């Protein structure tokens, strides 16, 4: 299936998909397709799908929000604080928020709460290897010195699946961090 051929309203359905790679890919295409006032409406809609009231929790919504936002910075400016604050919501797939912060780093850099401080706080709180991988990715893109994190987790044997921009890579957290350190 070619996601590029789908309308944005259909692409959103793939943000619910059990295949994680499809979630990432659909979010990227959604970000490229949705522009202007439509971007604002889609971001609002995706935030709605993260709330209890919607009754239709969308696991990939943070990915969609970030991709639409990074392609529509003038629109995302009004949502960046709320987006970074999603890290405090335990019901949200926070590794996707961390990834999205990295993808939209130029826009969220000056958000409140401070994304660097919030990501570091959540690494301590969450402790999940996948979250740590995406958080370190985001911290590095934000320009933070992650050498302390790399040193701390360099011997981790935990296996993570990490989206590298084209595919899901299954590797040890320590091996992934070696790559991050070399970038």
UniProtKB/Swiss-Prot annotation:
This is Uncharacterized protein AF_0829. The lineage of its organism: Archaea, Methanobacteriati, Methanobacteriota, Archaeoglobi, Archaeoglobales. NCBIfam families: DVU0298_fam. InterPro entries: ARM-type_fold, DVU0298-like. It comes from Archaeoglobus fulgidus (strain ATCC 49558 / DSM 4304 / JCM 9628 / NBRC 100126 / VC-16).
